Curated annotation (Swiss-Prot):
Annotated organism of origin: Saccharomyces cerevisiae (strain ATCC 204508 / S288c)
Domain Sm, first and last residues per copy: 31-110
RNA-binding recorded as keyword: yes
CDD domains: Sm_D2
Gene: SMD2
Record protein name field: Small nuclear ribonucleoprotein Sm D2
PANTHER family: SMALL NUCLEAR RIBONUCLEOPROTEIN SM D2 (PTHR12777)
Amino acid sequence: MSSQIIDRPKHELSRAELEELEEFEFKHGPMSLINDAMVTRTPVIISLRNNHKIIARVKAFDRHCNMVLENVKELWTEKKGKNVINRERFISKLFLRGDSVIVVLKTPVE
């Protein structure tokens, strides 16, 4: 990747240069965590704005953190009076809109 593409404003880049820049950013920038998880098919932990947590494999994603996930386990808690109930459900495939994502973590190695 030439520094000429990285340093130039995006509106000056051609479509091919924009695609090359996006690919570079996915492999070397903050999105590399999601890209690596997608390529190696390792699960990630995703914390959502509604305080739910998701453990899933990333099938696809974009620059807005929209993700297609598979083998999804969603975890959350519910309060019933003084009792706290841990809830979970399984979803085989899920499209997750990126604006609900707070943080994406690698799953710990067991």
